Amino acid sequence: MIQKVPTPITPINIDKATRHITLAYFDQKSTVDYIGAVQGIPVCFDAKECNTDTFPLQNIHEHQVVFMENFEKQRGIAFFLISFTARDEFYYLRLAKLLEFWNRAKEGGRKSFRYEELEPEFFLPKSRGVLVPYLDTMQKDLAMRD
């Protein structure tokens, strides 16, 4: 079971007619978008979107990376699901692969990664409907850890 983690906000303006929040600010830093367990394995992941073939690492915050590293130290599995909107493709970014890009940037290298640098076997198969079929790809990630 995977649940969406609510992002804590403080409303500033509320449209009285529709009761919709029109302006708000974040109360605190959020960790990940989703958390739960799959077949007894703790899972957390964050969803990101990219409309080009270059993903800026500034879209991922250090506190998220630290949270995910600590999550994996507790025998969980952490990853990012990235939607490459211009290509209509989803990618499962393993935390280990992200850390390669992250450490490269920390050492003065590129502060982004390119589509071509990604592992082809972690692109998600197309599916009908609105669901993102990441479970089979997560199994590949787990198999690489054994």
Each model region followed by its residue ranges:
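Short, basic, glycine/proline-bearing loop/turn elements
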Residues: 14-20, 46-54
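Conserved catalytic cores of phosphodiester-cleaving nucleases, focusing on short active-site segments
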Residues: 33-52
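Helix-rich interaction surfaces within compact, conserved domain-sized segments
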Residues: 2-7, 96-146
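Short basic alpha-helical hairpin corresponding to helix-turn-helix/winged-helix-like nucleic-acid-binding
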Residues: 23-30, 42
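Mg2+/Mn2+-dependent nuclease catalytic core
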Residues: 48-74
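Acidic-basic catalytic patches of nuclease active cores, encompassing PD-(D/E)XK
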Residues: 1-25
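Short, conserved beta-strand edge motifs with alternating hydrophobic and charged residues
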Residues: 3-5, 44-47, 81-82
